[in-house]
Amino acid sequence: MAGINRAGPSGAYFVGHTDPEPVSGQAHGSGSGASSSNSPQVQPRPSNTPPSNAPAPPPTGRERLSRSTALSRQTREWLEQGMPTAEDASVRRRPQVTADAATPRAEARRTPEATADASAPRRGAVAHANSIVQQLVSEGADISHTRNMLRNAMNGDAVAFSRVEQNIFRQHFPNMPMHGISRDSELAIELRGALRRAVHQQAASAPVRSPTPTPASPAASSSGSSQRSLFGRFARLMAPNQGRSSNTAASQTPVDRSPPRVNQRPIRVDRAAMRNRGNDEADAALRGLVQQGVNLEHLRTALERHVMQRLPIPLDIGSALQNVGINPSIDLGESLVQHPLLNLNVALNRMLGLRPSAERAPRPAVPVAPATASRRPDGTRATRLRVMPEREDYENNVAYGVRLLNLNPGVGVRQAVAAFVTDRAERPAVVANIRAALDPIASQFSQLRTISKADAESEELGFKDAADHHTDDVTHCLFGGELSLSNPDQQVIGLAGNPTDTSQPYSQEGNKDLAFMDMKKLAQFLAGKPEHPMTRETLNAENIAKYAFRIVP
């Protein structure tokens, strides 16, 4: 037999060559014991090696394997390249001292005081985030939904918080209604991690559901023997998902990470909604109100009273608003910019403004007596306003006069007071009281920082003058009505969400978005309660210059 290994008495291995084929000269010179193409060629002994009669050291694993029976080409290549020698193996077995053992760890060099100072803020944020999660769980919020909405808020996408989530988030993120939630906020980052852990804990503690039986298929219904056959293997290749476990299938269920934005309200102030409140939802709500038989003039009066004087909306109109999906009240802590009643109010003013004045339904008004009976004791005739609703029992002269000014644009204070104050001697005091409530705000108009009309009409701000654009595209006042710099009865301003020093010009980063409005209507709104209509912070004549910007031609 060719290539049989034999061992002598001393335990040294030698090769017996029985191949009858002649060997090459190189093989004769080197004393190689095999020249077959099927066996590896043993390298010749170096010149400085001891003679062959000296006792040879025990062969290594490579030599023993090379002297074995005929090997394949892959085995020879692995033998020549991959198998380690004895020297390599001994080197690999030496213990090596790592650099980490030679040098102390960085954590060991830190002092306890420095570590405590560096980790204290993060521990505070973690504890705060955990308390928010506990509050959400105790209020029954959907933690998975909260986690998704928080992710959208940090990314600047649209969100749809529930009432519970919105109330809790406003407690811990007070600037959320105006500026959203920053992705760099440490509390937001820790809260996102706490919500992720809470979702995983809920998933782990949930009861295991039995997998839904899948419909029978040729691959799934075949017997065990056929599964092990060639046909069974082919069937599994054609339908690979049939053989997966239920856990694998459940883990690969697609998750919609971009929820649809239908009926979702942006957490940041939407400039498009601020420029034009008559959007599709408001128009659809108006159509629904008309189908219910609601008088649009009565609706406009109720909305103006609720927005400007914070008077409750009548029950019948409130019920109709609820039927079209609009909350008939504005919470004290809610921004007016984001409330659908403002959208409805703007759309309603646009719709009624398109109608001829002769076709408008009359507003509820005080019964008008004959002209002969309207003379005052001093011989003067009463001044009748175009819109003069009935006076409420709880309204004093100042409150009723401010409401008349709001309902009758262009009418002066004296004319409005003369319309409902019968005693001529009492009129000057009422006029002074109304001006005292309005003038401190309106008198600041000329002192405000300016924004040119060209800058206001840029794509960033998007102001559109009613004198230059179509009615459907013009900018409306936050409290209703089209805005135009050519209207002498209006003081067009842009009210910012953030205050800045009066020496600084407007900047998107510092002041955030602008809400365009008539400063006269803003003064009437602040006469009832001096608070910012968007942030609910204190807004009066002393600090309005830090928020407002005058739009100039």
Curated annotation (Swiss-Prot):
Motif Interaction with Pto-kinase: which ranges? 325-328
Q: Which EC numbers characterise this protein's activity in its record?
A: 2.3.2.-
Stretches for region Disordered: 1-123, 198-227, 239-275, 361-380
Q: Which UniProt keywords apply?
A: Hypersensitive response elicitation, Secreted, Transferase, Ubl conjugation, Ubl conjugation pathway, Virulence
Q: Describe its assembly.
A: Interacts physically with plant cell Pto.
User: What does the sequence similarity comment in the record state about its family?
Assistant: Belongs to the HopAB family.
Query: What name appears for this protein in its UniProt entry?
Result: Effector protein HopAB2
